Amino acid sequence: VPTIISEINGNPQIAKMGITQATGAMEGKEQRFGPAASGYWSIVTTIISTGSVNSMHDSSMPLSGMMQLLGMMINAFYGGCGVGILNYFIYIIIAVFISGLMVGRTPEFMGHKVEAREVKIAALVTLLSAFLLKGGTALAAYFVAHHANIEWAVQPANWLNNPAYHGFSEMLYEFTSANANNGSCFEGLGDNNIFWNLSTGIVLLLARFIPIIGPIAIVGLLANKKFIPESAGTLKTDSLTFGLMTFAV
């Protein structure tokens, strides 16, 4: 909803030029879709990891770009659609652990105790995502800032068509998209070169397989533990309270 409203209201910088925007922010959008449908799909596609676009995300309003990034960084909205269900499972394990600490009981999930090993794996998977997208962005920003004219096939100085703040957002979006296995990007970034193809490929591989291995390992550990019957002190994971806790995590 915030994205659709932002796109319908148009670009204030274009409005300052005296240009009428009766149809909303149309830069980078097709007339057959318009700003509302384009804004809506830009969020859906970044949440469910389709990678398809019906508008240029690089031309979206700032709020829209932020929401697109958020959708890929969380990668578990809509109940964890697609591979996001693995991330959602990790969030549940962390939420169960924190909730157990808050009430002073050993955390339990589906009749099995959640202990140190499970939480460590969940924490590593969660931190990996942040490390990959932020580490990759930091590396790219370093080359742009300090080795802009290095003798590569495509010099870092030629990567960015928007060298200011938005250029940084383009690099962040690129690695966020690779980390979320999404496929969309801010196309102001010249990313068809050996650096971006290799770096995002490595990020994609790590972000795809480690979050698969982690939850499977957790399930294996839980399956080997003795089943604990539900009691009065058992944390109910199908309650509104636990839903809010998961959302907070």
Language model segments and positions:
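Membrane-proximal intracellular helices of multi-pass ion channels
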Residues: 1-249
